[in-house]
């Protein structure tokens, strides 16, 4: 599974005229299930995402996770947006291949599992809508962006 995470001041996702998720300071995570991914891979990726230290401590060092963005136990928001294009194979030609991505039904199942697990472990979780044409708006903080990937 893959997550492209961005530290944000705020972010939201819309489907048409409807806002499906919105956060203040925290992490926007674009999430993709690959062929062969399992719940174990989703759990491993979620643990990494929730524990990844990308927020600055009092000394200005990236040393705090999304669960403690202010150093006093204050949790930041987590906006999870499905994005199968992260699994694209771009090694040949001028058109990406999406063969490495999980099939849509499996991708939806794993994304839903990931979201449910995140909601059990983090107090502020918002989402996009799997398979929808979404408009994502964000204000990067830094910018700070990381590619997280775990293998099944």
From Swiss-Prot:
One of its GO terms (cellular component) is cytoplasm. It comes from Burkholderia ambifaria (strain MC40-6). InterPro entries: Daa-tRNA_deacyls_DTD, DTD-like_sf. Its main location: cytoplasm. SUPFAM superfamilies: DTD-like. This is D-aminoacyl-tRNA deacylase. One of its GO terms (biological process) is D-amino acid catabolic process. It is found in: Cytoplasm.
């Amino acid at each position: 599974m893959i997550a492209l995470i961005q530290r944000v001041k705020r972010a939201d996702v819309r489907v048409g005229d409807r806002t499906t998720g919105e956060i203040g300071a925290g992490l926007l995570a674009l999430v993709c299930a690959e062929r062969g991914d399992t719940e174990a891979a989703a759990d491993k990726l979620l643990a990494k995402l929730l524990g990844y230290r990308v927020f600055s401590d009092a000394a200005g060092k990236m040393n705090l996770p999304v669960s403690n963005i202010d150093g006093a136990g204050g949790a930041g928001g987590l906006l999870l947006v499905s994005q199968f294009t992260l699994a694209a194979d771009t090694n040949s030609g001028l058109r990406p291949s999406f063969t490495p991505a999980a099939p849509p039904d499996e991708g939806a199942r794993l994304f839903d599992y990931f979201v449910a697990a995140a909601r059990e472990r983090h107090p502020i979780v918002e989402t996009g809508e799997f398979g929808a044409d979404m408009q994502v708006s964000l204000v990067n903080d830094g910018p700070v962006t990381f590619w997280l990937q775990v293998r099944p």
